[in-house]
Amino acid sequence: MNYRQEYEKWLASPALSEDERNELKAIANDEMEIENRFYGPLEFGTAGLRGTMYVGLHNMNRHVIRWATQGFANVIRAEGEEAMKKGVAICMDCRNHSMEFARAAACVMAGNGITVKLFESLRPTPELSFAVREYGCEAGINVTASHNPKEYNGYKVYWSDGAQLPPHHADAIAKRLEEIDIFDGVKRMDFEEAVKSGLIETMGDETDRKFMANVTAMINDRETVAKVADTFKLVYTPDRKSTRLNSSHLSRS
C-alpha cells in the first residue's frame, strides 16, 4: 500500500474522530505532507517509538499507540498466563495527549486480558522502573519524549527488570507489528469497564511513598545531609518532562 492509499484508508476509517478526520481533510491538497505522514510506520526499537503528534501512520497519535500496544501485548501473551497476570505498569509525562495515550495503551492491554497498574497522573521515568520491580510486573510503558520539543511524544517500553527492552524483545514486537492492522487488528476494552473488572488499577501516593523511601534509603551519609539541608541551594529545570512529583517530593524530603 502506497502513502496515498494509506491516507485514504485512514480518512475512511470509522475509528477516527471528527476532529481527526478534519485534520486529514485539511491536508488533502498537500501531497508532501500526506507523504510525510503516511509513507511508512514509525520504527519500533529498544527505546520504543517517538515522533511528532499528528494524525498519521508515521506520527504519534492514539491509533499508533494502540497498534504498538497490541504488538507488545502479543509478545507478553506469548510468555504465558503468569506473565499476563503480572501485567504492565504504565506512566506518562506532562506533554499534550500523554494521559490520553497512556489510557489508550491501558485499554489495549486490558482488552488482551493483561492486568495494568496505571499511574493516576504524571510520574518520572525512575518511578516507573521502580514500580515494575516493586509490584513484580512483566513489563512497563512510559508515554514520554524525554528532551524533545513539545510537538513530540513517545512510547518507551520496559521489561521486568525495569530497564528498556533488550533487542530480542524489541525485535519480537517489531515483527508482530508487521502482522497487525492498525485499526482492525487491535483488541481493546472500555476504560471504565476495565477498571470495574479489575484489569486496570490506578497507582498514586502509596507508590510515591514507597519510591521515595527506596531513594532516601540509598543516602550513605545522613549526618552530612542533615547539616547542609537547610542551606543547600538547588537549581531545577523541568525541561518539558515530569515536574509536579519531583518538586513536591524534593520539598518534603
Residue ranges and their predicted role:
Residues M1-W67, R176-D184, E201:
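Cofactor-/ligand-binding subdomain signature composed of acidic, glycine-rich
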Residues E33-F38, L42, N153-R244:
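Gly/Ser/Thr-enriched, mixed-charge loops and adjacent short helices
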Residues L245-S253:
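Single conserved hydrophobic/aromatic residue that forms the stacking wall/gate
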Residues M60-Q70, H97-S98, E120, P124, ...:
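Phosphate/oxyanion-binding active-site loops and adjacent basic polyanion-contact surfaces
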Residues T69-V88, N220-D230:
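Glycine-rich phosphate/diphosphate-binding loops that line cofactor/substrate pockets in enzymes
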Residues W10-S13, E81-S160:
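Ferredoxin-reductase
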Residues Q70, R103, C107, P126, ...:
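Residues on a specific face of well-ordered alpha-helices
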